[in-house]
Amino acid sequence: METLFNKKLTVGGRDQESTGFAWWAGNARLINVSGKLLGAHVAHAGLIVFWTGAMNLFEVAHFVPQKPMYEQGLILLPHLATLGFGVGFDGIVLDTYPFFVCGVLHLISSAVLGFGGVFHSLAGPDTLEESFRFFGYTWKRKKKLAAILGIHLCFLGLGALLLAWKAMYGGGVYDTWWPGGGDVRSITNPTLNPFIIFGYLVKSPFGGEGWIVSVDSMEYVIGGHIWIGILLVSGGFWHICSRPSPWVVRTFVWSGEAYLSYSLGAVATMGFIAVPMVWFNNTVYPSEFYGPTGPEASQAQAFTFLIRDQRLGTNIASAQGPTGLGKYLMKSPTGEIIFGGETMRFWDFRGPWLEPLRGPNGLDLNKLKNDVQPWQERRAAEYMTHAPLGSLNSVGGVATEINAVNFVNPRSWLATSHFVLAFFFFVGHLWHAGRARAAAIGFEKGIDRSREIARKLKPLD
């Protein structure tokens, strides 16, 4: 029997003495064998794509068309529906076949990637430099690594432009702001004004500003993807064709572990940005598929009770709550008419079911009394009872105890999982960045294990 303390333990034909890393260090054992590292890279991509395809088909098999997606614990089908596949007016699923096709295509792709990963891990050359010079690299070849970065940027840019093409020419995307309840439509006139697109980056993240999370137009979303796609492709060609400047060479650490830390930091940043986006934004993440946001559920409850009590004869304009403030309507810090009660904290909420009832100074009292449509009432009642909040009493004025059993709003799951994973990626970034910098400076000593008692233990057998 081999034990954890046996340095000669061989996994995948590599041991601690030949690689400098123990078996549990994973791909660190492949740091100097580019061919095998490519195999691990491709196999990892295959696993990701396999999960995507398998989970996609799992969700299709369990999907019930009569129920909203957000009631069924789905996280992949809402993304496909947002892209305009299989859905129509009001987010109604018309055909699940596009979902099925997407899952099968991912499974086929994962098989190709899996074969490539196994081939390069077991049968391919140890290093690419000898057999495939174009694909070969070493960690110190700065020009080559800059070109690899450029290739990655080009592919990311093409992905962003592909979304723009789908929205403009490939059948359109789902727009929750379409009058009367949302629909799939082609974005024929995306906004390309740089002051509008990049203005989101300098907006405050607080209150009614909301940084990039406040985007509420598909024209802005697609226009932003066009800008990002062009910038990424342009930057990719720049890095492919140019050499790193001297100040770049001096600033960055050039080693495999340093590149790993940069990548982990980038993924962590994207994960942290995704958290408020999926939690607050109902344009990119339509509530028809992902369920209401927290503020949306709270505002929906206030709206539902306002409509109910108004029909019972209440004067919604003058009724006061127990604090003396307006029970149904009140003034916001900026002077707008907003919903009263505990939902006042969400006064800056914007949603497609509520915006038709606004006027030049917030909610329009005349519209609330005379123009409320049945679809708005139904949607508000539905969102009120599906808040992304788990509580035994109430949060933000939303009574959630009725839904606390056997219901998790997809926004809760997606926001929490992205935050937790982004945090771990960020910790990994700090860890590997510290190790890479220490190694570059030359004072990385590691832990002194010469006196560890484990070194004196005999194998168990």
Curated annotation (Swiss-Prot):
* Cofactor detail note: Binds multiple chlorophylls and provides some of the ligands for the Ca-4Mn-5O cluster of the oxygen-evolving complex. It may also provide a ligand for a Cl- that is required for oxygen evolution. PSII binds additional chlorophylls, carotenoids and specific lipids.
Could you state a single Gene Ontology molecular function term? electron transporter, transferring electrons within the cyclic electron transport pathway of photosynthesis activity
GO terms for biological process, alphabetical = photosynthetic electron transport in photosystem II
According to the UniProt record, list the residues that bear N-acetylthreonine: T3
Q: List the disulfide bonds.
A: none
Q: Which GO terms describe its cellular component?
A: chloroplast thylakoid membrane; photosystem II
Locate the transmembrane regions by residue number. 57-81, 122-143, 166-188, 243-263, 279-300, 435-459
**Record keywords:** Acetylation, Chlorophyll, Chloroplast, Chromophore, Manganese, Membrane, Metal-binding, Phosphoprotein, Photosynthesis, Photosystem II, Plastid, Thylakoid, Transmembrane, Transmembrane helix
Propiece residue ranges: 1-2
In the bilayer, the protein is annotated as: Multi-pass membrane protein
Q: Where in the cell is it found?
A: Plastid, Chloroplast thylakoid membrane
- Give residues where Phosphothreonine occurs: T3
Which residues of the sequence carry a binding annotation for [CaMn4O5] cluster? E355
| Assembly with partners or alone | PSII is composed of 1 copy each of membrane proteins PsbA, PsbB, PsbC, PsbD, PsbE, PsbF, PsbH, PsbI, PsbJ, PsbK, PsbL, PsbM, PsbT, PsbY, PsbZ, Psb30/Ycf12, at least 3 peripheral proteins of the oxygen-evolving complex and a large number of cofactors. It forms dimeric complexes.
Q: Which HAMAP family match?
A: PSII_PsbC_CP43 (MF_01496)
Q: What does this protein do?
A: One of the components of the core complex of photosystem II (PSII). It binds chlorophyll and helps catalyze the primary light-induced photochemical processes of PSII. PSII is a light-driven water:plastoquinone oxidoreductase, using light energy to abstract electrons from H(2)O, generating O(2) and a proton gradient subsequently used for ATP formation.
User: Its family?
Assistant: Belongs to the PsbB/PsbC family. PsbC subfamily.
The protein's name is: Photosystem II CP43 reaction center protein
User: What is the name of the gene encoding this protein?
Assistant: psbC
